[in-house]
Amino acid sequence: MNKSEEAYARLTQKIETGELPPGAILSEAALIDAAETGRTPLREAVQRLIRDHWLLAGGGRGLQVPPISVDDQLERLEVRRSLEALAVGLACARADEEQLAAVAAHVRHLRTVEDLPAYVAAVGRSHELLRTIANNRYLADSLVPLQGLCRRFWLATTKGLPDEVERGRAFYVPALEAVTRRDSAEARAGVLALHDFLARSALDYAARSAAHGSAEPPAPWAEGR
């Protein structure tokens, strides 16, 4: 990766985990510090971050980390749903044996994950596999920000909920296992079931927020920092 790509990766990771919290207004100096880079690579990275919806242009106030929004999450899921269904269909037809072996190994690992941080990492790996095994770089590039911002929403809105690891795993494992068998119908069905679950999760968060009069959750992982 060049310096601009490194800056993009650092900033997206910090936005996803809440280290740069939802709604934060960031100056160029703050972004340079967070990205651990210089002004030129940062400005190149910022153009991409705005295009990919990781940052919002804030006029003279600086750049803003997008607030957590149920409407935005549902819009992302509408697009991601179709792209991931396409991805698993392509993977069943195109993935080579080495790629399928990597998926099978990941499924075995996913079954053993117990704590939330390890599960978060496993979800990220699941998303990476869904992008790469389709062997279509345009599809992969489209999925990167959608998956990352969806993970941010999930982290911010489900932290502390019981059985969240088991609930998510119950959808990822069948979809990925179907890919290892090259069963495109089952893989697509698994992905669509996952997205039904994610949409319900977003709506459940909206209902909880309305009941408690809260419009935005605290930043994920903020406790103990």
Q: How would you label these PLM feature ranges?
A:
Residues 124-126, 133-158, 200, 214-225:
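C-terminal regulatory/oligomerization modules of transcriptional regulators
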